[in-house]
Amino acid sequence: MIIDLTEIQDIHFFFRLEFFKEIYEILWVFVPILIFIVGITISVLAIVWLEREISAGIQQRIGPEYTGPFGVLQALADGTKLLFKENLIPSRGDIRLFSFGPAISVISIILSYSVIPFGYNFVLSDLNIGVFLWIAISSIAPIGLLMSGYGSNNKYSFLGGLRAAAQSISYEIPLTLCVLSISLLSNSLSTVDIVDAQSKYGFWGWNLWRQPMGFLVFLISSLAECERLPFDLPEAEEELIAGYQTEYSGIKFGLFYVASYLNLLVSSLFVTVLYLGGSNISIPYIFVSNFFEINKTYGVFVTIIGIFITLVKTFLFIFVSITTRWTLPRLRIDQLLNLGWKFLLPISLGNLLLTTSSQLFSL
């Protein structure tokens, strides 16, 4: 059998085309991940700038204004400074625990973003147990803080790590019970299904109106999980210098700084998804469909609008969190634990029982 030169060239071209197609499919998998990383980075920088401007307004001072227009590049300048600072390690500390602690805290929080629906069909992984995966992953972060405190070989750092673990356990349980109530109302543990269940009646279909007590408990528990004032006992300056961060410097200290704002952002996003309708607009779907032709496959414009609505609701909660931080005093450790175990836990349990009863009677 004789094969001429043209056929050989066609075969080589076909194999080359298939190779480039496989490379393109592999690279396309990383495009959504890259978009999420860039979006999260910009959001964290925006939150840092907002916090500095809001705190300056509350305290009647100017705030950052020289680094970029209106001081928007101040957070970037601070991050660059931390990147080039010397990375100090305690001579008598556990180097492995000391080094892995910040990384575990940051990675566990970043993984939580994988189940958040930012818009229609704009979610990294739509899992059937999305909200439980978030709770499971977020519970790993205090382990990193405890490792950091123990590995520092410093009494203030160790006490800060113990406080972080105790605080996380105290407020993780009420938060989980509130998520269970939302899952019962939506008949699903998927974040996408929970958002869809709130879309039928627009503004009045939000879980905020059906679960007002659960919303308040979830709000307080989220602030406590973020370890922000009035719940920043693990890093109380007057008592523990900087808590588990005391011995850290350079990029490792920067990781804790980033983890704090990443946690605030992910908590705000879950408040939006679980209680504020996610990416849904406030107009009921029935009324919108009468005026606009809505296809099953939404376009890019609808996705962008959904992302914009999600971010607006999220930054509204972030504004409340920042204002709370700069207006309320810090709780004592006994007040913190009493609030979690004696008030929020019974309220969340009662809310879960009421939700279960209403769902059973509605069958």
Swiss-Prot record:
The chain crosses the membrane at residues 28-48, 98-118, 129-149, 253-273, 300-320, 336-356. Disulfide bonds: none annotated. GO terms for molecular function: NADH dehydrogenase activity; oxidoreductase activity, acting on NAD(P)H, quinone or similar compound as acceptor; quinone binding. One of its GO terms (cellular component) is chloroplast thylakoid membrane. Its main location: plastid. It is a multi-pass membrane protein. It catalyses: a plastoquinone + NADH + (n+1) H(+)(in) = a plastoquinol + NAD(+) + n H(+)(out); a plastoquinone + NADPH + (n+1) H(+)(in) = a plastoquinol + NADP(+) + n H(+)(out). It is found in: Plastid, Chloroplast thylakoid membrane. Its EC number is 7.1.1.-. InterPro entries: NADH_UbQ_OxRdtase_su1/FPO, NADH_UbQ_OxRdtase_su1_CS. Keywords: Chloroplast, Membrane, NAD, NADP, Plastid, Plastoquinone, Quinone, Thylakoid, Translocase, Transmembrane, Transmembrane helix. GO terms for biological process: aerobic respiration; photosynthesis, light reaction. NDH shuttles electrons from NAD(P)H:plastoquinone, via FMN and iron-sulfur (Fe-S) centers, to quinones in the photosynthetic chain and possibly in a chloroplast respiratory chain. The immediate electron acceptor for the enzyme in this species is believed to be plastoquinone. Couples the redox reaction to proton translocation, and thus conserves the redox energy in a proton gradient. Belongs to the complex I subunit 1 family. NDH is composed of at least 16 different subunits, 5 of which are encoded in the nucleus. This is NAD(P)H-quinone oxidoreductase subunit 1, chloroplastic. It comes from Phaseolus vulgaris (Kidney bean). The gene is ndhA.
